[in-house]
């Protein structure tokens, strides 16, 4: 009788993990549905239009007819357990699709035969390569009218390399596909399959010198003997298989299941993920082995937060065996939790299981401490273990929000925190300069969905608007100001007189206050009141309502009254003297200038640089970063970047990406200043 450890090892080798990635409308969800149905996991294929697919179970997904979340499913075929992750295809939802790559051996990039290679397909191929995953391309919707599949295959090879070779070819006459790896003979829409068979075998044997010699001697090698070199070719990116399917008609779906089971890597054959031990510069690579007998290491690649069910962590087991009785630590946490209930997911349904081995994708519920990207482990010494970080796009599209009902600020923060826990590309920040709570996401659609979730899931209403620009005010010349405050109301009066001087300071120097009063013209106890009045203007602005910065204020003379002088009188005099001085010191409004980096296709560089110039930006340089991509660097006013991602998408067919970081402040053009000061005067008059 085999030992338990041998049984678990065999179970682990009978696992495949696959993420369906690529552009929206490529048919990823429909393909997942077809695979589930063909494997007998569901009785009939659901429909996206009817909102009945397993993967798109969120009410918002059903309403929008698009995937918005990564959805985990499982099925069995030929004795092998297949974990399948369907991912959204929109660039606004990379926070959902990219983490799925951390949980699988193979990234399957799905391409719509009718629309060809789209930017998201290119992007996901790049991300998968950067994580050293086996990659395959699935051409879906092959029964679309007027499509040249031969031309599309040529486009795929031109875009991704000659290592993209078909494992099967379409046979339109019989509405099926023909295997060309195990099968040497037969015909397809591309002609005889023998040429495709030879190309595959030659590509595989190239990674093993012994097989190369044998192939040259015998003219062919039985594909059944090529499993080890095939897996090596997949690991090294030397082979990127291409499969043709139609999720609508079912053509190629059964063959795709066979490919997944027979040819794609199991957890022992794929490239192991890059785990690190330690933090920062001290971090060093750590060996993790897909061995069910070792201590547990698992990685949380998705978190969901339900207002009724609580927090659920979905994770991939990389090492060791989990059971319901396992005690797991979360990251650097000191207190373990008991698993209790372990689930496999089938869309929104949870199927309880007794254990999980390397390769399994499972979930635990009602664990409040769990968080995205956490490493779960059962050995205290494995604290400070983490996965090498993913290069997420930086969320730069902002939206200021505030509760519709006054007094709900704390609840707003709590709910927004729950949404951010589910989405690594959603950032929440309180911007002190404008006193706003700002949501930062990957685009307009991303943030619109966040607001929809607030309303529909949490029944919480917010007011949303573009974030205010953090303008500043300063002066460019030295000037003097004077004000006498005198108020007599019949009883005790108020009196204070202040003479002061203001001087510009270098950018970033802040505020300086000096007392040069001599002879007791203003008694020392009233100087802080003068400064208080000045600081009121600093905070509220003098010409446009924005904070005043980089000025030096010197109080040098004044008058007081032995009875009527009070703090309030000198605060008022100081404030109004400061305002008078600013008006004479050539005041200007400063605007934030950001450093921008834009990655775009070569053919879009001219459009992007021209557009940047039209936004009052300055291009500082361009550099070739490879793969037909150019990085454009420059500086541009923050105010000119409203809805920039939408414009960039239009100029680059969705392939453009940008990041920004605050660089410096500089004076706005006269026309802009006139508009800002005019708006402020109008506001003050209301």
Describe each region flagged by the PLM.
Residues 1-686:
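Structural and coupling elements of P-loop NTPases
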